[in-house]
Amino acid sequence: MPGSAPTGSPPAIEVAGLSKTYGGQPVVTDVSFTVQPGSVTGFLGPNGAGKSTALRIMVGLTRPTAGRVAVLGGPYTALPNPGRRVGVLLDASAQHAGRAGREVLALSALVMGLPEQRADEMLERVGLSPAEGRRRAGAYSLGMRQRLGIAHALLGDPELLILDEPANGLDPAGIHWMRTLLREFADRGGTVLLSSHLLREMEAVADHLVVIGGGRILADGSRAELLSGVDGGLEELFLRLTAADTRAEVAG
């Protein structure tokens, strides 16, 4: 359960020297950064930058070629009942298409040792009606699947959320809802690592920004630090950094 993070708390996530290659091709190269408790950290980069690979390594779905990731003090896979401490949404389309939305949540609640009514509470929290909860997840729109995925991430009342593009498919009202939810989660002491292409929303909600390009960290700092003197805000910073990275690759 989120609560105020004590001063001097260790990082919620610590990534150190992370590298991953596929078939000899580097996808992530010597990536290091931390996610501090009680904050929203934005993880930004163009398509193919290595964001999703890094997130999959964090939660034990992909093995790194080198380096390590500590989630709440150790490997994610070593956490007992990890859903009670870390909420994860990497791919909203990965939900069982043949099960009703409520059933997806109720089964996970059972695995976590939570009462079945928790499924109903989470459906309400993310704005899915009881009737929508009885529909098969395969019949959901992308926006509804995203809401179900966020409900699943919140199911165990975790202290940390790891979310990959959770706003995909949400309409403007849904994006505003998600931004408010994440900001309130962090303000209550929770921690969020958020990957998103929605730069304006990221600028509005993130406390800290990590920009990745070509599998390497291009920038890492507080939002205030990185945007100081940048008239065009996060969009200008992002385009400037990624354009410079592209030029460096061409020159190399």
Predicted segments — roles?
Residues 59:
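Helix-to-loop junction immediately C-terminal to a conserved catalytic motif
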Residues 161-165:
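Catalytic Walker B motif of ABC-type/P-loop ATPase nucleotide-binding domains
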Residues 106, 110, 116-132:
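Conserved ABC ATPase "signature" region
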Residues 67-82:
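Conserved ABC transporter NBD signature motif
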